[in-house]
Amino acid sequence: MNNKTKKNKTITQVYTQPIYCIKQVIVVVSNDMNSLKKYIDKSIDLNRYTNADGLTFNNVTYKNKSSVCIYLRPSEFSDSVDNVAAHESFHAASAILDCAGVKLCSNSEEAFAYLVGWINECVMKTYYKWLKK
């Protein structure tokens, strides 16, 4: 299956993060950036991000819960999906831990590492669902 066949396909997953003040991680995997409009502030101009392979939006409220939203523009043929997923996972983890008052330092590396790993796993699970659809 080529990218033209999958062009308008969107997979969205909402993952619960029960430990910190931001309770949800929303992952949107789509070639259509407009699929983000349901989750992000209406004032955000998505045209500014047309070349982005990934984005993370903080301060998102979805179903009355504080959330972060990660967008991944997928490609079946790209070697960079893992890198983009890890990059955006770090941004999301930083937002979540910042909300909890945890700053990145040698004493907080484990908290960051575990949270980045968990978020990256969520992003990749959603991406693999996109590939299979």
Task: Show where each model-derived region lies.
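Short coil/turn segments at secondary-structure boundaries
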Residues: 76-80, 104-107
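Active-site scaffold of zinc-dependent metalloenzymes
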Residues: 37-79, 92-95
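Post-HExxH zinc-binding segment in Zn-dependent metallohydrolases
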Residues: 104-133
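Short alpha-helical catalytic segment bearing the HExxH-like zincin motif
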Residues: 80-89
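Catalytic Zn2+-binding segment of zinc metalloproteases
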Residues: 89-106
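N-terminal low-structure segments adjacent to metalloprotease catalytic domains
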Residues: 1-35, 67-69, 105, 128-129, ...
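Compositionally biased, intrinsically disordered low-complexity segments
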Residues: 14-17, 47, 87
